[in-house]
């Protein structure tokens, strides 16, 4: 359960970073 949650958090983090880089 913890690994699945961590994977989701990492995935969301990468998506957010991608959006930020796209805006800059």
From Swiss-Prot:
Q: Which UniProt keywords apply?
A: Amidation, Antibiotic, Antimicrobial, Secreted
Coiled coil spans: none
Entry's localization field: Secreted
Q: What is its main location?
A: secreted
Q: Which GO terms describe its cellular component?
A: extracellular region
Q: Does the keyword ATP-binding apply?
A: no
Tissue specificity comment: Expressed by the venom gland.
A Pfam family cross-referenced in the UniProt record is: Antimicrobial_9
- Keyword Secreted attached: yes
Name positions with the PTM Leucine amide: 24
What does the entry give for GO biological process? defense response to bacterium; innate immune response
Name the family: Belongs to the ponericin-L family.
> In UniProt terms, what function does this protein have?
Has a broad spectrum of activity against both Gram-positive and Gram-negative bacteria. Is inactive against yeast, erythrocytes, and insects.
Q: What is this protein called?
A: M-poneritoxin-Ng2b
Species assigned in the record: Neoponera goeldii
């Amino acid at each position: 359960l913890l690994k699945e949650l961590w994977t989701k958090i990492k995935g969301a983090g990468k998506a957010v970073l991608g959006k930020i880089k796209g805006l800059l």
